[in-house]
Structure formats: C-alpha cells, structure tokens
Amino acid sequence: MAKEYSRTQRIGDQMQRELAQLIRREIKDPRVGLVTITAVDVSRDVGHAKIFMTVMGQDSAEEIAQTIKVLNSAAGFLRMQLAREMKLRSVPQLHFHYDESVVRGAHLSALIERAVAQDGQHQEGSASPDAKPESTEE
C-alpha cells in the first residue's frame, strides 16, 4: 500500500525542489555560496514555511548568518517565483534557517569513530581472556 502524505508534506517537498533550482538559477549574490535545501516545514494553514538549509564551504557563523540574511531578504522574490511555478492559492511566507543537524551528525560520527579506535587500542593492550597471567613468584 502506498504511503499517504499530508498536503503540507507534499507542498514542502515540491517547495524544496523548486527553491533549490530557483536559488541556484536566480540568486546571483556572491555572498550566497552553494546552498543545499535540506528540509521545508510548511505550517498547517500553509501561511508560513521554514526552510532549513546548509551552505557548502562556509563554516564560520558570520558567513552562515550573512547567507541567511541575504536569503531572507530575497524571500519575497523567491516567493513570487514559487507562485509562478507552483499551483497554489497562496504561497507561504518563507523563513530561512541554518540546518545544524548535518554538522551535529558529522560531530557525532567523529566521536563514535574515536571511541571505536580507543576501544580497539584498549583491547590490543590487554591480555586475551584465554591466556593465564604470568606468575612473578620465584
């Protein structure tokens, strides 16, 4: 049986695809790098949409904040372009947010790899469970 998605999820999925193309094609500001739209959450009344995004190659908080500021200032233009592409009675207001889950996921992955490596070193340093301890008595 096919999964059933709510209307807001379908709108969010389409907005994610359309916004990715629009930003790449229409936004020529040099402060906007390679933006990836990771998710779009549309409110139930379809009045607002939170757009979660990451920027490749921009790691500092200042660069990311600048990109978000540029995208939020271009939100009206992007909304107008979305209205042309999507067949909706009203297009939601766009609010751009930085998606920290990607950075958090990479950090957790690095922590897990480090813990596994330390565990492997610890096991190599200890005696095998079948070996008998050497006696130091003479």
Curated annotation (Swiss-Prot):
Q: Which UniProt keywords apply?
A: Cytoplasm, Ribosome biogenesis
Q: Which gene encodes it?
A: rbfA
Task performed by this protein: One of several proteins that assist in the late maturation steps of the functional core of the 30S ribosomal subunit. Associates with free 30S ribosomal subunits (but not with 30S subunits that are part of 70S ribosomes or polysomes). Required for efficient processing of 16S rRNA. May interact with the 5'-terminal helix region of 16S rRNA.
The record's annotation in Gene3D superfamilies points to: 3.30.300.20
Give me the ranges of the annotated region Disordered: 117-138
Q: Which family does it belong to?
A: Belongs to the RbfA family.
User: Which InterPro entries does the record associate with it?
Assistant: KH_dom-like_a/b, RbfA, RbfA_dom_sf, Ribosome-bd_factorA_CS
The GO molecular function terms of this record are: ribosomal small subunit binding
Official protein name in the record: Ribosome-binding factor A
GO process terms (BP)? maturation of SSU-rRNA
Q: What is its main location?
A: cytoplasm
Q: Which GO terms describe its cellular component?
A: cytosol
Annotated localization: Cytoplasm
Question: What Pfam families does the entry give?
Answer: RBFA
NCBIfam families (alphabetical): rbfA (TIGR00082)
What is the annotated quaternary arrangement, including any partners?
Answer: Monomer. Binds 30S ribosomal subunits, but not 50S ribosomal subunits or 70S ribosomes.
Q: Which PANTHER family match?
A: RIBOSOME-BINDING FACTOR A, CHLOROPLASTIC-RELATED (PTHR33515:SF1)
